[in-house]
Amino acid sequence: MNTEKLETLLGFYKQYKALSEYIDKKYKLSLNDLAVLDLTMKHCKDEKVLMQSFLKTAMDELDLSRTKLLVSIRRLIEKERLSKVRSSKDERKIYIYLNDDDISKFNALFEDVEQFLNI
């Protein structure tokens, strides 16, 4: 690998690390949380989605373990960036969704990230 490619790789790493530290300090979130939040925006914006179905999709698309996904989902719910509701017919079923407040927080967060990264 030549020096130019190594410098490019180092630049990506520094940007990744800086973003990770920034969102941790400002929002108390991880990059996994951002990835899960982005995926929920794609799949749960218009309707409530069964948690089990979402976990299967997220495991495939994000290549994260079930445990890491559940940690991120729980953190996002605690930070009020994602909403959940239990089924009235079967209490074992949990649905996740984004309400209007969650969507506005999502947009503000990702606009802030774009500004931070200058993209």
Curated annotation (Swiss-Prot):
It is found in: Cytoplasm. One of its GO terms (biological process) is regulation of DNA-templated transcription. Residues 55-78 bind DNA. Belongs to the SarA family. Its main location: cytoplasm. Involved in the regulation of virulence genes. Acts as a repressor of the agr locus and consequently targets genes regulated by the agr system such as sspA, hla and hlb. Binds directly to the agr promoter region. Keywords: Cytoplasm, DNA-binding, Repressor, Transcription, Transcription regulation, Virulence. It holds the Pfam family Staph_reg_Sar_Rot. It comes from Staphylococcus aureus (strain bovine RF122 / ET3-1). InterPro entries: SarA/Rot_dom (IPR010166), Transc_reg_Sar_Rot_HTH (IPR055166), WH-like_DNA-bd_sf (IPR036388), WH_DNA-bd_sf (IPR036390). The lineage of its organism: Bacteria, Bacillati, Bacillota, Bacilli, Bacillales. This is HTH-type transcriptional regulator SarX. It comes from the Bacteria. One of its GO terms (molecular function) is DNA binding. The gene is sarX. GO terms for cellular component: cytoplasm.
